[in-house]
């Protein structure tokens, strides 16, 4: 058996079977931020005008792959509910594009879709009953359960947490009951906001779930041994390990949050719009589910665009990097010039 056949079966290069057979693959995309028109945009940043074309490329790229389902982690569209005319137009653009997906799509509400998490200093309006009604009218349930073989995927509305709305208690009771019902199965959680991105006791900020809801959610991860958590919102890739749960923060398909460019020692070029158009940081995840684990593959899109009406280029070959989980002989290493683990403070507004 050759190396490529080993990888397809979830084997490492020695022929062992730490993961077992591959069961299926899902795609996780996030922060697509579709605008109300092909080039119309209510953002002051030029790169945001490309969101629709970049999403169209992602849809066609997904259609080339063998995937079982697609989960969008929120901020489907860019106009917020406070501007209902633009919101509705962006919804129409989103639905037109995803109607071409071959795999079924499931959506998580983001702060642009249903209102920001409860706080007094958010740049947009917070979640409320009217915004919830708008979401359910256009996209369906705020939270849901998806069963695939012995895996259970829970999609939640993170903006409800700490809101005090009646739906918060309903979601809380639903999630606790559903997790109890899923005992013995492999559990995955999908949320727009991450519980945290630096450490579990970090201060409240724009990009995490506030207390006391954060501790409640983390407690559920621990209690039910959730295999993996996937979140968006920060438009940058992060990986954390919370007890036994792998926590992934996904990149955006549309643009990068320029405030996080301050983490790096080299300033963005003018073409990168202060880091907002840093092309190698754009993409999505393929989550390969095996019998005894999962492997996340980051697909970089490099901001590729597909204008409306153009035919997709299906001649470009699909290539994948072999993941270390699939290669027990991965022994290559090198000394870092700069510490990747250092903690860097960034300005809160970019």
Where are these regions (language model features)?
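Active-site glycine-centered loops adjacent to acidic/histidine catalytic or metal-binding residues
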Residues: 31, 74-75, 110-111, 192, ...
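Active-site-proximal beta-strand elements of phosphoester/diester hydrolases
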Residues: 23-40, 150-160, 188-190, 245-252, ...
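Histidine-centered catalytic micro-motifs
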Residues: 34, 189-195, 229-237
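Binuclear metal-dependent phosphoesterase catalytic core
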Residues: 237-349
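Residue-level marker for buried hydrophobic side chains located in beta-strands
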Residues: 26-28, 70-72, 107, 189, ...
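N-terminal active-site segment of His-dependent metallophosphoesterases
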Residues: 1-84
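Short acidic, glycine-rich surface-loop motifs adjacent to enzyme active sites
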Residues: 77, 182-199
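Extended active-site neighborhood of metal-dependent phosphoesterases/phosphodiesterases
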Residues: 3-18, 45, 81-186, 207, ...
